[in-house]
């Protein structure tokens, strides 16, 4: 989202006077005279009634009024501005409809970008900004990823508690529209806990697992098991379910669902989507150890009909998690490569062996090229001697 600098031609006193008159004319309970306590008291009074303009004003007119209020706010010293900024942010969350919510969002974004980057108030503005963005379906305009979020607060990082609160909000506003992003947010949230306080993150850990399982684009689930709050769930059904998605095959999930159907449904997980994901994960696991698989093997392992094999493999190839070739004539699937479901010691050893083999091959090639080069030089010298 773009934001323009705030510039108002009138003096502060003149702006305050005009704003007071404007809101009084709209019927707000406010005096048209300036406060003798100073501009901060004026702002408190103005912000207290500023939402009256939401009733009948045009969005463009309201944007101008809010812009004027912001231009005054950013002149207030940091040590005296917190209550003013918080009061304004709270008012901006009260927009009665989507068009006005967009105006409020723009105003908060303007305030956010005009505050000093080292100001701790930016966190509070951003938190409310996300709330308003949800109201007008503009979340991705203000939040595109965790890295972008951290860069916003590089000069004044919020506390762990503040970030946990913000991550929970971001998860809530993205879970219905972008499960992949929501899952990344929850993983980041769990990463803010330490061994000392991980035990209190039970609810967050469960949300993180459910979000990751529900995301149709998240397949590498092994890293979740290493998160401290997730470890505290060992022995719980949700941890057992996660373990199945990490390393077990489809029959294990089917059995779990038969035994704990109510639990799976209570978590908001869709059984058919779970089956689809487990089939893909099972296929990946089979591909790790089998360079080729028959259609008969796939129908048995994936619990699908033979007619469903080809469409299934095509869907797998679209994910780019597996590289393979269909052999319809021989009713086989030939595997070129696959992403591993887990990446532990065996996978590191396999990678080490592969790199060692590459190193040896490169050494052989270099030695061969050296010999060819030496032979060419000898041949050239001999030809010179002959002539």
Swiss-Prot record:
It is found in: Cytoplasm; Golgi apparatus. Keywords: Cytoplasm, Golgi apparatus, Initiation factor, Protein biosynthesis. It comes from Drosophila ananassae (Fruit fly). Its main location: cytoplasm. Component of the eukaryotic translation initiation factor 3 (eIF-3) complex, which is involved in protein synthesis of a specialized repertoire of mRNAs and, together with other initiation factors, stimulates binding of mRNA and methionyl-tRNAi to the 40S ribosome. The eIF-3 complex specifically targets and initiates translation of a subset of mRNAs involved in cell proliferation. GO terms for cellular component: cytosol; eukaryotic 43S preinitiation complex; eukaryotic 48S preinitiation complex; eukaryotic translation initiation factor 3 complex, eIF3m; Golgi apparatus; investment cone. One of its GO terms (biological process) is formation of cytoplasmic translation initiation complex. GO terms for molecular function: caspase binding; cysteine-type endopeptidase activator activity; translation initiation factor activity. Residues 181-340 form the PCI domain. The gene is Tango7. Belongs to the eIF-3 subunit M family. Component of the eukaryotic translation initiation factor 3 (eIF-3) complex. The eIF-3 complex interacts with pix. PANTHER family: COP9 SIGNALOSOME COMPLEX SUBUNIT 7/DENDRITIC CELL PROTEIN GA17, EUKARYOTIC TRANSLATION INITIATION FACTOR 3 SUBUNIT M. Pfam families: eIF3m_C_helix, PCI. SUPFAM superfamilies: ARM repeat, Winged helix' DNA-binding domain. This is Eukaryotic translation initiation factor 3 subunit M.
């Amino acid at each position: 989202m773009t934001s323009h600098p705030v510039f108002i031609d009138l003096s502060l006193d003149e702006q305050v006077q005009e704003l007071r008159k404007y809101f009084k004319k709209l019927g707000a309970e406010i005096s048209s005279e300036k406060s003798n306590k100073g501009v901060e008291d004026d702002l408190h009074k103005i912000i207290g009634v500023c939402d009256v303009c939401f009733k009948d004003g045009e969005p463009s007119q309201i944007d101008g009024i809010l812009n004027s209020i912001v231009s005054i706010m950013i002149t207030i010293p940091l040590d005296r501005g917190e209550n003013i900024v918080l009061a304004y942010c709270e008012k901006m969350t009260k927009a009665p409809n989507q068009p006005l919510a967009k105006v409020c969002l723009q105003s908060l974004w303007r305030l956010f970008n005009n505050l000093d980057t080292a100001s701790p108030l930016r966190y509070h503005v951003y938190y409310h900004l996300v709330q308003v963005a949800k109201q007008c379906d503009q979340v991705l305009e203000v939040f595109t990823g965790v890295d972008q979020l951290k860069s916003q607060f590089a000069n004044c990082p919020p506390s762990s508690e503040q970030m946990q609160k913000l991550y929970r909000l971001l998860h809530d506003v993205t879970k219905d529209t972008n499960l992949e992003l929501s899952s990344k947010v929850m993983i980041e949230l769990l990463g803010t806990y330490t061994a000392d306080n991980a035990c209190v993150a039970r609810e967050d850990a469960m949300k993180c697992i459910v979000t990751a399982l529900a995301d149709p684009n998240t397949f590498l689930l092994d890293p979740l098991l290493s998160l401290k709050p997730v470890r505290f769930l060992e022995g719980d059904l949700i941890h057992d379910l996660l373990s199945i998605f990490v390393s077990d095959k489809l029959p294990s999930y089917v059995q779990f669902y038969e035994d704990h159907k109510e639990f799976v449904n209570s978590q908001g997980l869709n059984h058919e989507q779970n089956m689809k994901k487990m089939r893909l994960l099972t296929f990946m696991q089979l591909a790790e150890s089998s360079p080729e698989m028959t259609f008969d093997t796939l129908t048995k392992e994936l619990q699908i009909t033979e007619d469903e094999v080809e469409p299934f493999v095509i869907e797998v190839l679209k994910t780019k998690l597996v590289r393979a070739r269909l052999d319809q004539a021989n009713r086989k699937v030939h595997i070129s490569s696959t992403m591993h479901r887990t990446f532990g010691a065996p996978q590191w050893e396999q990678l080490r062996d592969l790199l060692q083999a590459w190193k040896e091959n490169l050494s052989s090639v270099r030695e061969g090229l050296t010999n060819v080069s030496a032979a060419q030089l000898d041949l050239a010298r001999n030809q010179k001697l002959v002539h």
